[in-house]
Amino acid sequence: MLSLLVIFFIKFEKIEKGESIEQIQSPLIGKNIPNIKIIKFNENQKISFSKYKNKRFILNFFASWCLPCKIEAPLLNKVSSKIPIIGIAYKDKEEDMIKFLKNYGNPFSEIGVDQLGSIAIEWGVYGVPETFLIDENGKIIYKHAGAISHEVYKDKIIPFINND
């Protein structure tokens, strides 16, 4: 708990200094993904990251009530044909999430549910959307806070997909 408090204050200090949220780096970069249980939406099973072993994938925290999530939806739908994307529904109601996916498309290979926000805390998420690029060894190599822009798509996601 103390470590989360320290991370919060470091991030808050950087925001106060004028750094944009997108520029703030995660302490998880270069580390293995957190080993926590994520229950799948509409299933009583957990997401198994072992099936992504030796594969690159994207993990995206989103919510139906999140305007930037709606803005990035077309790019995530475009990316989903090239690489698996795991979605984590953050503090969302089931019926709202279903409506969101119907209206904006479902780019996700699997969807996990984070009703209480505890999964987001473990991942160091402080808002939605946040997107993580995870390499074939299960290491987080990049984190983006905020909606995925065409620039991030071109400069970060495409090279990640192409393993450049």
Task: Set out the residue ranges of the language-model regions.
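N-terminal targeting signals for export/organelle localization
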Residues: 1-37, 164
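Structural microenvironment flanking redox-active thiols in thiol-disulfide oxidoreductases
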Residues: 70-105, 115-121
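A short beta-strand-turn-helix
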Residues: 36-57
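Thiol/disulfide oxidoreductase modules built on the thioredoxin-like
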Residues: 103-107, 114-164
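Short pre-active-site segment immediately N-terminal to redox-active cysteine/selenocysteine motifs
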Residues: 55-57, 61-65, 127
